[in-house]
Structure formats: structure tokens, C-alpha cells
């Protein structure tokens, strides 16, 4: 693949746009679904939870989230206008029933009041955070006391084999992510690394190592 093509893939993964963006949203939902479910399960969702997700993509997983417990409210934040629209369309029933709420944001400031959420999660977004420490402090601010944050990401050892990650991506190992978290008031209360077979963005089957870090306020 040419450099320009790789750069285009990286840009679409960071911020899907246009027809290619819809395809990318569908593909990300399929290839990341195990990671997303792992993140959701580690939240240990309980009845009445208010849950925030950063960077939900097309949000094809929200139905699974609502199966975890009764009386949940889900709030999704997205930087991509296209994914925001797709997520609202795919989850239109939850939106009309006032169970799911989608908003756009700038990736830095979380447009919600302090201590609103009991659970927060984010999957495959950490590579794109412009100000990681600042964003973690924002998440800390909107979490309730004893609230849980799950950060799920593919390990640097896997990601650096993908040619497009040289653009736009800041890759993380578990150790690097832990060092980042140590700069914030969060406590790490759990971590798990799993390996799964996935089809790469270029089509072949590869082993992917991914990690979920479970943090508590």
C-alpha cells in the first residue's frame, strides 16, 4: 500500500467521514466487538447505572450494554459527525425511549456536569487522545465517587505491526498506560490482557493482544 493510502486509513480510523467512513464504522464494530464486550463486562454494570462512552463509533454494541441490567442510561460522545449520525440511526429505538443519548465533543472537554456517571468506558480511542492526562482528569471529574472507568486498547506489540499506525496513532503498552494513569488520582483495580484472532484491516487473520484496565475514582 502507498503511504497516502495508509494515511487515509489512519485518518478514517481516527475520524470516519463520508461513504468510506460508514464502511470503516461497520468494520470497526465487527473487528472490535470482543474488545467492546470485554470493556462492558468489566464495568460490572448494575441496575440504575448512568454510563458514558467516549468514541462509540457506530455504537452497534449499545443493545448488548442494555442487556446487562435494568434501568440503565447510556451517554455516548463522539468526535465524528458521521458516527454520531450512524449511532443515532442504529439505536433510534433507545434514543426515542430516552435510554440512549448521543452528543458530539472535541475530544478534550467532556460536556457534562461533575459526578454524573457511575461508569465510563472507552475502546480503541487512547491512541488518539490529544491530551491524555487532561482527558483522564475530565473523566475523573464526571465520575461519581467509587465510579469505574474501563480503558480497552490493543497492545503496542500488535499495533506497531500494522503499517497505518505510523500516522495519527500514539501506541500504548500496558506499562505505558499504567504510567499515564499514575499521573492522575485514579486507582488501578484490575487489568486483563487477552489474545484473539482477528482479520486485519488489510484482510489476513492475525493474533491481537488487547488489554482492559479497570480504574476506580
What is each of the regions a protein language model found here?
Residues 50-109:
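Class I SAM-dependent methyltransferase SAM/SAH-binding core
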Residues 1-20:
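N-terminal, positively charged/glycine-rich alpha-helical extensions of SAM-dependent methyltransferases
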Residues 184, 197-217:
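Core SAM-dependent methyltransferase catalytic element
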Residues 108-119:
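A short acidic, Gly/Pro-enriched loop at the edge of an enzyme's catalytic core
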Residues 133-145:
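A short glycine-rich, Lys/Arg-flanked "PGG" loop and its adjoining helix->strand segment in the class I
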Residues 118-131:
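A short SAM/SAH-binding and catalytic strip from SAM-dependent methyltransferases
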Residues 148-178:
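Conserved class I S-adenosyl-L-methionine
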Residues 30-49:
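Conserved alpha-helix/loop element of class I SAM-dependent methyltransferases that forms part
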